[in-house]
Every structure is written in structure tokens, then in C-alpha cells.
Amino acid sequence: MSGLTHFDAAGHAHMVDVGGKQETQRIAIARGTIRMLPATFALIRDGKAKKGDVLGVARIAAIQGAKRTADLIPLCHPLALTRVAVDFELDDALPGVHCVAQVETFGRTGVEMEALTAVQVGLLTVYDMCKAVDRGMVITEVSVREKRGGKSGDWKAEDTAG
């Protein structure tokens, strides 16, 4: 199991010891997309969904998702997040919505999982609020786009289109 930090020498799962790591500013940016029917897109764009402000509710859900990541992903460390920012971009061409989450902390481990969870929960909330009119929505292309801080340094996805 070499290279996989969440397994010990015997192959058993464990939470990685970060006690000896330096505390640094950690930032991660994740992005994902939900594709939908044009009529569903219009409901969101025009603020006419029966359940209310889809993107407003999805933003709050995404922030809550980032905060609850350690409760959902068994080997994630609970982190004191210093910032969670979530933005939605309407894309007429898809049609669909892009979700971008930036998560920050000052600590010993990165916040990539928190950023990914924020995006997923935000997009799942869009699905939940619109599924009555469009069960065929597709959540896609969820990925970490950038991370900063820590021993491994900064990283940015080569495909900067997303």
C-alpha cells in the first residue's frame, strides 16, 4: 500500500498523524457542474422554482457541507475553517450551473476535501430543489482546480478552462 497515506504497513486504514506538520495557510478551490433541461435552467435563472431561491439555498448547503466534511468522510480531520466562499455561474450554453468553492484554514492539513464536499453538496441541493421538474440532471466534472499551502506547495490544474 505504498504511497497511500491512509493505510498503515499492514494495510489497515488509519487517520494520518499531522501532529508534526507545520501550521500554514491552506486554500483549496474546487469546481463542478450540473447540466439540466433548458426549462429547468430558466426556472433557476428567473427565480421561479417552486421551492424558492435555488442558488441561495444551495450556497448555504455548500457552506454547511464544507463544515461537516469530517462527519461524512471517515478519515478526514475535523478542521477549523477560516473561510468558505461559494459562487454559482449560470451557463446558457449547457444549459446548467457551475459551482465554485474556495475553502481556507490555517492548519496542518489541506482543505481539498472540504472544497470538494462543498461543491458536491451545493450541486446536490440544486438537484434536490429541481428534481420535480427534471430528474435527468447530471452532476459532472467535479474536481480540485487549485490548492495552496503546506509542505507539498502550490498546485493548479493544468486545464484552467474550468
Swiss-Prot record:
Tagged with keyword rRNA-binding: no
Active site positions, chain numbering: D128
Enzyme class (EC, first level): lyase
SUPFAM superfamilies: Molybdenum cofactor biosynthesis protein C, MoaC
MF (Gene Ontology): cyclic pyranopterin monophosphate synthase activity
Annotated signal sequence range: none
Function as written in the Swiss-Prot or TrEMBL entry: Catalyzes the conversion of (8S)-3',8-cyclo-7,8-dihydroguanosine 5'-triphosphate to cyclic pyranopterin monophosphate (cPMP).
Subunit-structure text: Homohexamer; trimer of dimers.
Name of the featured protein: Cyclic pyranopterin monophosphate synthase
Protein source organism: Burkholderia ambifaria (strain ATCC BAA-244 / DSM 16087 / CCUG 44356 / LMG 19182 / AMMD) (Burkholderia cepacia (strain AMMD))
Gene (name only): moaC
